[in-house]
Amino acid sequence: MTKSSRTPISQPLQHASSAILVLAILVGAASWSQPHVDGSDIWWHLASGQFIWQNGEIPLDDPFSHTANGDRWTNHSWLWGWFFWAAYDGHADMAAWLNLTLLVVLFALVAWSAWRVSRSWLAAGATTWLVAASCHWFLDVRPQIVTLLFTALLLSTLDWRRAPWLWPPLFALWANLHAGFAFGLGLIGLCALLQTEQAVRCRQPLPRAAWVGVVCAALAAGINPWGFAIYEVPLQHIYYESPFGALIEWQATAASLDPRTYAGRFWWVVAFTLVGVLSGKATRFSIALAAVTVIMAISARRFIPLFAISAAPLAALGFGAILDAARRRLPAISSDWPRLVASGAALLVAILLWNGVHFLPRPLQRWTSGESYPSGAAAYLAAMPDPPQHLFNYYGWGGYLMLQAPGIPIFIDSRASTLYDDGLAADYFSMLNAEQGWQEKFEAHGVDAVLVPTQSRIAAALRKQRLAWRVAYVDPRSVLLFAPAGPARTRLAAPARLLPEDADLLLSRGFQSRRRGNLDRANTALLAAQRMDPMQLFIYGELMFVASLREDADELRHWTEEALQVYPRRWNPIWSFAEQAWDAMGRCEESLEALRKIRLGGPFIADELRNEVQTRIRESQCSPVR
């Protein structure tokens, strides 16, 4: 058949297969957009945005804590907080929809860059899905998405003749949205440097426009409330030996090829990137950028998304080389109908990837694990007529308290080293773990109240003091304690006097009744709470524990299944609840089976916890349920 005779049929088929593949790429990539992590950063960003909207000014000093109050605060993401607070204030879930929109645009740019180098939508699709899967755990609602998006934008426009003219306005915006602008400057600087080296080697005109663009972009980044001092924020992480470096996102990436784990997906991106390098089609710039970012990602897992996006063109070349080899062996798969069938199959797979991904209802709560925050204790604090002024709080809850209990100074939050010094970080970890000398640190900071996880060491230590701290509010997530001395003690009110009869109050009531052994009262309160808020995950955990104490195996299984119906992919907390409940019943086999279902492949699973679970499974004396 001649080319002219098949064109009327093949051209529409090619367009159709390409359109279906593009749709499949975006649908499939978006399925990875909802990680199961406690997105603690969003709350302080929203609190900052709220402050700016309400006061009409950008705070240059910290207005939220009692440990750094009045100290200089470089809020490099103030504009993100301003935008997202406006969305959140209209409706909380608008922040989730806005983040999803940014991610779809990000994946579209990654796919476009991958297609441009590979000229294959199949290769571009495989690359984009692999990139999305490797980024999955890091895609919570926070400003770093802007850096990923703008990095993809730079990579997709670098070869535009007038691209350098776009850089100054882009970096003026970027420097007010996220400190990752410094990476972007490094990216365009690397590009200009390699262009210069090639020009000198080949005796061609120097890339003056590129260097003018780099210099103007660096200057434009200074257009922000802190001027060129904004550069201090990214530069302080180059040699990061602060106690904040103990945070798990700054730890090195593990070695694994298991695609179910964050590390396995990262190393598979590395593998396809290497295939792309060996294809002989890679540019020196793409190789150099991948080399820089892979070192960053290996040294700190938080940089995995930057590497994946930066290496996407090379990975696409790798997939393209594999597809080319397959076509040479099986020429028939290159014809139009097999391509159309492959496109349809890709769309079907993309739809199946959404299995178990429940975006509705309450997408923001699902995206941030919102039910894990101390909403009841925060409401109690906000309702107090004379709240504490020197609260010691759990690190990951500081931003939440800034938003939900405004006006109550906090001890620390996830603004980390952009505000708090290393000494405070060391004090925090010592106090939280009730290490030697914690009492002196409490006195030095004037702590008059504590809000920490219920099972934390410091909560137990405070209740064992000679003058025990008084519990104002407690539920499975958190405990709020007040110092034994001082006028605050006499003014403490029962939660029922300050809080409405909502799911939080009923959860607290059920939790306390269960601990006292009053199982009927606990069950009644928890069932009422579950009817009121079926998305409060900790209610299901408490109902499992009540069933365990009643030795009701069927009821325990029922509430496990109910929790999985609400949160099909919130495996770890649900199976952790089930494991503890079965263990309390003395049901070794069921406990072991639940323990085996806990997934340990995420980047925010501490090595100690991973090793403990694996050791318990390995040393168990019973066999799993068949």
Where would I find each of the regions flagged by the language model?
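Transmembrane-helix signature of polytopic, membrane-embedded enzymes
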Residues: 23, 110-133, 149
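Membrane-interface alpha helices of multi-pass inner-membrane proteins
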Residues: 28-29, 131-135, 152-157, 164-179, ...
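Transmembrane catalytic cores of multi-pass membrane glycosyltransferases
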Residues: 41, 53, 179-278, 308, ...
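Short hydrophobic/aromatic helix or loop-helix immediately within or flanking a transmembrane segment
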Residues: 52, 67-93
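Transmembrane-helix motifs of polytopic, lipid-linked glycan transferases
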Residues: 97, 101-117
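Specific aromatic-rich, kink-prone transmembrane helix
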Residues: 109, 131-134, 146-163, 188-195
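Membrane-interface transmembrane helices that cradle and orient dolichyl/undecaprenyl
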Residues: 152-165, 271-281
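C-terminal luminal/periplasmic domains and tails of membrane-associated envelope-modifying transferases
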Residues: 358-400, 404-411, 416-626
